[in-house]
Amino acid sequence: MQLNDVHRGITKHRPRKRIGRGPGSGTGKTSGRGHKGHKSRSGYSRKPNFQGGAMPMFRRVPKRGFNNRWALTIFAVNVGKLNDAFNEGETVTLEALAAKNLAKGNFDELKVLGDGELTKKLTIQAHRFSKSAEEKISAAGGTAEKLAPKRTPDERVEALKSEK
């Protein structure tokens, strides 16, 4: 083999495949589509959920429930986690929780629950508090500031309608 033989047979642009040009071409008669069947016909397109004529999976599986478009997404956090994550005298908000990677995602409201021990004096701003959480916060010398809801249910419905 010589250096000038290296690129022999390799072309930059491969010639297009000429189908249906007789048996000698290798793609004559059926033009590479095989014999009969839906895929051999012109205008064929397979639906993404077509399963060969069998009952499709989405029809076999039972359906349950629904997704409530107007439901609030509430992030719940226990006072024990707040005790571990925050220092004495700090203010706890949904933004502060997100900054400390405790609340990941978008939430409408923050709810504080009473599991765990709270020994630090914290100012907690949340939309909802459980009774035990309020008791533990006040026992530790902190304050529980109740925030007004971000949006009323009617405002949420209007916002969703305006998105369309």
UniProtKB/Swiss-Prot annotation:
Protein family: Belongs to the universal ribosomal protein uL15 family.
Start-end of Basic and acidic residues biased regions: 147-164
GO cellular component: cytosolic large ribosomal subunit
Matching PROSITE patterns: RIBOSOMAL_L15 (PS00475)
Species for this entry: Rhodopirellula baltica (strain DSM 10527 / NCIMB 13988 / SH1)
Protein name, entry field: Large ribosomal subunit protein uL15
Protein task: Binds to the 23S rRNA.
Keywords: Ribonucleoprotein, Ribosomal protein, RNA-binding, rRNA-binding
Biased composition (Gly residues): 21-31
Disordered: annotated span: 1-57, 132-164
Basic residues compositional bias, start-end: 9-20, 32-41
InterPro entries membership: Ribosomal_uL15 (IPR030878), Ribosomal_uL15/eL18 (IPR021131), Ribosomal_uL15/eL18_sf (IPR036227), Ribosomal_uL15_bac-type (IPR005749), Ribosomal_uL15_CS (IPR001196)
Domain of life assignment: Bacteria
Gene Ontology molecular functions: rRNA binding; structural constituent of ribosome
Listed GO biological process terms: translation
Subunit structure: Part of the 50S ribosomal subunit.
